[in-house]
Amino acid sequence: MAAKAFSTAASPPSMAVGEDMNRPYILRAAAWLRSVQKTDGSFGETCQTYEDHSLKGQGDSTASQTAWGAMGLMAAAGPDDPAVIKAMQWLIDHQTPAGDWTEEYFTGTGFPKVFYLKYHLYRLYFPLTALSRYRRLLAIRQRG
């Protein structure tokens, strides 16, 4: 998930240059994200995925990985997609009273199977980016 969801989260630039979001590779990416989304709307994947590929898309939920999945789905399906709405709600529900998110798991790859990185701002940057994109897409839709 780390690599796949991160790359799908980067798809809004594809939209900006006119990429057809109904192309088969985009639809496959969105279908994969939906297949690994947890019933509560979150996403998570363990770093052990690099050693055991059967664990792809499985692991404890994290705010950064939920944001990555949500941004990929937003780009592919828009803000009204039920999977996007569930992910946004999970991010909102898991904010601390201070307005941030806790994240104890490593979500940075580093060198797979050698070492992993903990980017301390991922837990803030990516959820805020996802929520702001969601809000912007809703505002654009309302303006017509």
Where are these regions (language model features)?
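An alpha-helical repeat/solenoid feature that recognizes helix-turn-helix modules
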Residues: 1-142
